[in-house]
């Protein structure tokens, strides 16, 4: 009897999983229509079906949420680093300008041309240093963001999310960005399993546009 009950429960679980997969797939198909036609053509039924399968238990939603939080923290940190560097350069320029003004005021007129020439060389050297430091900072930012993108790609690939692998191909990157946007929109609309609802505790549900007035799924 227990074996029979267990078998029934497995069948019921399978049916629930199939229904959940259908609902996620329908929601994805609806969202894809909002993308440019060039990307719609690349997101085949198989790709969307595989993506829906990966999203079934809600784990990928949690992974994406974590990756986005890390990305935002990284971007904020890099922005603050560049802002600090800009402030340092502003202070440096102000101090140099003040130093030059004071030196010119104390300089005898016949020595002024020599002093100004020396100050110009010093100013050019400082500006060169500033440009090099800004260039190095920008390179650091680009490399750090590239590393984060690669980490995201690798993490989502390991999680079995369709379309994700480590690449620098611009077209593939844009496709992956669109896939992330689809996942994010599903997340915002509440399309996740109740057990893994990112701490919100609500039941798994479809977006309002995918349900009739009684809350039943509407076929695509």
From Swiss-Prot:
Short name of one Pfam family: DGCR6
Keywords linked to the UniProt accession: Coiled coil, Nucleus, Phosphoprotein
InterPro entries from the UniProt entry: Gonadal
Tissue: Found in all tissues examined with highest expression in liver, heart and skeletal muscle. Lower levels in pancreas and placenta. Weak expression in brain.
Chain coiled-coil ranges: 76-142
Induction summary: Increased levels in several tumor cell lines, including lung and colon adenocarcinomas and mammary carcinomas. Strongly induced in Burkitt's lymphoma and lymphocytes transformed by EBV.
Subcellular localization: Nucleus
Bilayer-crossing regions: none
Keyword hit for Phosphoprotein: yes
GO CC term (a single one): extracellular matrix
GO terms classed as biological process: animal organ morphogenesis; cell adhesion
Family per similarity comment: Belongs to the gonadal family.
Role description: May play a role in neural crest cell migration into the third and fourth pharyngeal pouches.
Name of this chain's protein: Protein DGCR6
Organism the protein comes from: Homo sapiens (Human)
Classification of source organism: Eukaryota, Metazoa, Chordata, Craniata, Vertebrata
